[in-house]
Each structure stands twice: as C-alpha cells, then as structure tokens.
Amino acid sequence: MKILLVGNHTCGNRGDGAILRGIIDSLHLERTDLDIDIISRFPTSSSYLLQQNILPDELFLETKKSNSLVAKVKRRLMPKIMMAHIRGSGFFKNLAVPEYLQQFTDKLKQYDAVIQVGGSFFVDLYGPLQFEHSLCALLAKKPVYMIGHSVGPFQKERFNQIANFVFSRVNSLVLRESVSLEMMEKAGITTQKVIPGADTAFLVRTRTLDAPGHNLIHWQNQIAASKTIAITVRELAPFDKRLGVTQQEYEMAFGKVINAMIERGYQVVALSTCTGIDSYHRDDRMVAITLGDYVQQKDKYRVVMDEFNDLELGILLAGCHLTIGTRLHSAIISMNFGTPAVAINYEHKSLGVMKQLGLPEMASDVQSLMDGSIIAKVNGVLDNYEEIEQQVARAVEQERILGNKITADVLKSIG
C-alpha cells in the first residue's frame, strides 16, 4: 500500500514535526509494509529534523514563482475551476485546470490514498489555497483522509464555500477537538464526514536517542541541575488584532509570570517549537530573548538557542517540572513525555485540545495572562502536582488509544 502524506508546512515548526512524526509512528505501528511518501514546503530542514527523506511540495513552490496580478487572478479562480471539474459541471469547467495542478493530480495516480496531516490548517485567515492538495486528490478520485485537524474560524464566505465543498467529499475529517465541530455547526459547514479524534502528536512513540548530541546533553544537565519550568512564546500576529493584545503587552505580562515562578524557587527555560531554520518566517527564540528584558533575576532565566527537533524537545521537557506553553504543541509534546502543561489559548485549538483531554483547567486564555490570573492557576497546578500529573498521564494514554484506533480504521478502509 502506497500513501502520500500532504499538508506539512515545515518541521521547522516542531509542532508540525510532532504531528507528522506521530502519524508516521502510528501508521507503522499498525502495518510495517507501508510505502509512505511525504511532502513539505521546506523539505531540506524537514528531512533533517524528522531524520527521514521528505519531498518538496510542488504546489507551494508554484505559488512562489510569480506574484504578478495575472498570477493572483489565476490563484483566486483556482478553487472555482477545480470544483467545477470535480463536479463535472458549471461555467468554470470550460476553463482548463491550471497545468501545475493537473501535473500534481496526475502524480497522485500512483498512490492508494492521500492523508492530509493535521494541525490548524484550514483557517479562514490562511486562505483557500490551503485546499489545493485536497482538491487535486478529489480530482484524481483518490481517497482523502484528513487526520487530527482543528478547523475554523469560518468568517469569510468564499473560504466557507470551498470548505463545504471539500469537507463533504473527503472520506473522513478527523477533528482533534470538539470546539472546531461547534464552529462548523455555527457557520453552517457540513459535518457529515467528521469523526472525533486526537492530535497525532500524541502518537509519537516516546523514546530516548542512541547517540544524543552534545548540545542536548548540555541542556539535559542544565535542566537537571535545578527545578525547572519550561515556557514557549510566540509572535502573536496574525492573531493579535482578534485578541486585542499588542506584542509588547503580551511579553510584559509573560515576564510577570516568569518572575513569579522564579520567586517560587524555579529556574525558567525558554524552549522554542518554531525557529528560523531554512528561512521559516517565525523564530520564537527572538521573542524569548526580548522577554528577558522583563525578567528581574536574569540568572534564573535561560533561552535555548539550539535547533532541537520535536523528539529532542520532548526529551528536554521530560526533565522539566511543568510547561507553560503559548505554542499548543509544546504543551502536547510535554504531556506526551510525561510533564504536565498549561496551554495559553490564543486560538480555539488549545482550549479544544485540553477539553478533549478532560483537562479544561489546564487551558488558560490570553486575558488571564494579561490580568495576571494565570499565575494563580499555575500555582494551583504546582500545589496539586502529583494528582494533576496522574490525570495528565491517564488522559494522554486515552488519546493514544483513540488516535491509533483511527489510524487502524483508516488503513482498513483503504484496503
């Protein structure tokens, strides 16, 4: 059986890396004879970080070739043309499928199925081009499985029309949390193919490395030397306007959380799930460095600058006492490796995943960061640590069972 995994942006976002590694681990757990191809927008860094061969995303490369007015018009018409050809009717069927999309569609004939790997991928702010791979797979008449997704918000009519078209035609849309389902229902998006599932980052097989790098060993020793709380931060854009919070306000508020944890006797280590490797446009390390301006005891605050992959981050987080994560997948990786985490939900996905785990109290909105109430929440976690640690372990195990069952069901339906 030959399967194509699409939708990975880059493993330079270690959350995307964990999502991809998890589905691969789960597929191989179920069947050892699978032939799996993977494509990514940034194949070089993704291959390096995942430690296996990854092919370039040809559709993404095409969008980088030209940004002329004609190219923009073509991209705007693309979904209408593709949908008309998939339907086999409509005015836009008179227009040819763009050559690069037809070429990609033809290449899909060698695969038994296409799996669109999860994450927060189908978001109105990201635009309709996110549906290109799925539209090509539907045109090629290949089974399409979307596994481990958060979808929405749905506040743009054009985006919603394409979402309805695609989501009604895929074999299954496996959601990793229920808040997305509520958003779909509220916006009138079809839910007939929805299956409740899990974030595939929970399916990463936790393991140690046979030959850990010296930089990993260094940070393991640093973390082991003093009781440690890990944090992850990010540039809030493009969500800052929806949140009504500026980047500086966010950083100042997070600085107060760090100071409170240091006063409680912890060192705080900033890890990053997104770095600028291979020209990736986000580098959380820069935000973490700026945060240092608001830390009072600077010798108790450290910023990790190394390029660790998601597995190495998990190994480091396993040595920490708690994770406070703006990046959802820092919280997921942390919990998967045995360390409780508080997730700051700047998007609905963090709250949704924590609800899915049965741990809604471990999600905290950005407002709680701004008004400082998150500090009391974190202190409450630390005061009841053993009980919460056990709750997290049970919840993660249930997610693994659910996620691996869905993988098994998908493979059975493919044949």
Curated annotation (Swiss-Prot):
Keyword Ribonucleoprotein in annotation: no
Keywords: Exopolysaccharide synthesis, Transferase, Virulence
Molecular function GO labels: transferase activity
Enzyme Commission (EC) number: 2.-.-.-
Biological processes per GO annotation: polysaccharide biosynthetic process
Pfam family, one: PS_pyruv_trans
Keyword Transferase: yes
Highest taxon above the source species: Bacteria
Pathway stated in the Swiss-Prot or TrEMBL entry: Glycan metabolism; exopolysaccharide biosynthesis
Purpose: Involved in the biosynthesis of amylovoran which functions as a virulence factor.
Entry similarity comment: Belongs to the polysaccharide pyruvyl transferase family.
Name of protein: Amylovoran biosynthesis protein AmsJ
Gene: amsJ
